[in-house]
Amino acid sequence: MKKHYLFFVSVAYSYPILRPLQDEIRRRGDEVAWFIEPDCPVLLNQDERWLQSVQEVMDYQPIAVFAPGNYIYDFFPGVKVSLFHGYPINKRGDEKDDHFSVRGWFDVYCTQGETSTLPFKELERKYGFFKVYETGWCKADTFVKERAHTPHNARPVVLYSSTFTKNITSAPHLFDTIKRLVREKNWDWIISFHPKFSDMEVLKKYKELAASCPNITFHESGLVDAKLLNSADVLLSDASSVIVEAMMLDKPVVTYCNTMPGAHLLNVTETDAVEGAIEKAISRPAELMEQMRAYVHKHEAHLDGESSSRVLDAVNNYIWY
């Protein structure tokens, strides 16, 4: 008898996180359906099943419900599984990272590496009502596959992706610098903003710049996936968790006013230092790359393409043992 699984989508960036898991569920001969919150865009493919009501979910009777977001409906059938929507990089620089907030929604947490597993194991011992399994992140499976298809760009490609957090985003501060570099340097650009980015005035400025410059591609959806990251040579960002994702693809990262800087990235605090940092990143200095790879391993310990398989095994272990 086929097992039924459900994906709970409350944020648009859930789609690229969940699809590798969907592939593994189907590979095992089981079934998966999607439940999408009303205020979340529906970005399903034709072959993906959409349950549009609570009654449909009840009739479907999933054995497990997976959510990359911070909450889930506790009255849905099945084990509630947290997959996370990023890595615990503590972008706000707080003493307490809200990545580790236990809200009482989940039975299982599927952690990624030592930076998430160790704190959640402590929380498991403290609360006792959930289990923690280090599986790796489902989305990381796509990065493993994508690395085999790294393009060789004729000109350096810079991907600019900023966080949506208002007091951290670099977007208002870097516009003039990016505008100048687009016109002066022999680089191509991709610009992408987080789906939650809400400053429409700033967004409009970047869109207008992209429309006026042939060497800029504006990525409308804001969903940064492995293919988009792999198309670039360098990531320019601030404190977004996409930083770790770029590094998983061996892409050096330049940040503006990063809240947790370190030797794994090229962080600048002045706009006039951005150009030199990008040039250095393009050259891929050996020490930077070594530090970057060590940093990635702390966050994602399982870059083997099998994280989705381990997630399903963890659910089976929780249910049957």
Protein language model regions, located:
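Catalytic donor nucleotide-activated moiety binding site of glycosyltransferases and closely related
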Residues: 31-45, 182-221
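C-terminal alpha-helical cap of glycosyltransferases
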Residues: 302-321
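Catalytic binding pocket for nucleotide-activated donors in carbohydrate/polymer assembly enzymes
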Residues: 103, 239-303
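Acidic, amphipathic alpha-helical patches
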Residues: 99, 178, 224-225
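Extreme N-terminal starter segment of soluble prokaryotic enzymes
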Residues: 1-6, 156-157
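Conserved catalytic-core segment of nucleotide-activated headgroup transferases in glycan assembly
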Residues: 14-26, 138-206, 268, 303, ...
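A donor-sugar binding/catalytic signature common to diverse glycosyltransferases
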Residues: 70, 76-82, 222-265
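Active-site and donor-binding regions of nucleotide-sugar-utilizing enzymes
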Residues: 6-146
